[in-house]
């Protein structure tokens, strides 16, 4: 039976030094680590993978909660307070992760702009100004200062580091389960017209799926493993996500922004086609096409973010949402480049 790709795999430069792989047999296939036999991640891989995943997804989660907090109507005081508390919880976790990640993550991850972009701080400042919501921008400033290592000396990672990161993963998972429950509650209330929230139900469902994806990763890491997904399962998740982003952008742009809306709809059609066309026999072609289309939507999102920040685009897209979806495209691009 063919080996299944371990989803998200290794989003950093591979280290094939046998010193770091005492319990696993790996081989490299198109720059992926494919698991041939069961076993545990090495200490180094567990720590670095955990930190990179948390740096990306903890920020994504806290921003989801910010979007919810600022999209509820003022009468929903309890729900607004719950969103704010959960957001602050992920801010605290992210601050810890940033502290431990310095010199412990890959340079390629830092340079990908998936953790922060050149626009993140300004987007946070404007979003806080426009909404009155609290955003801890000191975390972002610290992330701009992160440095990575291309190689690690023997003994760099100790058992204490593994315990610290394992505890961070567990606390992230505990909070994430509460966030998923909260999002599902909001979706049910909105679907039953018991609340009014300035977020499409499809957006709430979208951010719930992303949280469940993150939870799947953390559950696997608890066993020092990675979730097993086929290539098409991984591609379909992210291509569906990119199509969703294009759909939301189209819906939030002012009707007068006809060119931008038309471009967004082109991306919807393109990513939908990739999702429908991915099979075992077509996966290599879909990987290449996904890379090409994701580079284009990344450029589109980057231009849109710049336009929104300088007040050059008419929309109801909050600045941090523009930067948020740009980072997700950057994350997917790094994965695709490794696959291709």
Where are these regions (language model features)?
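Surface-exposed peri-terminal alpha-helical interaction modules
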Residues: 23-340
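N-terminal amphipathic/basic-hydrophobic helices that include classical n-h-c signal peptides
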Residues: 1-37
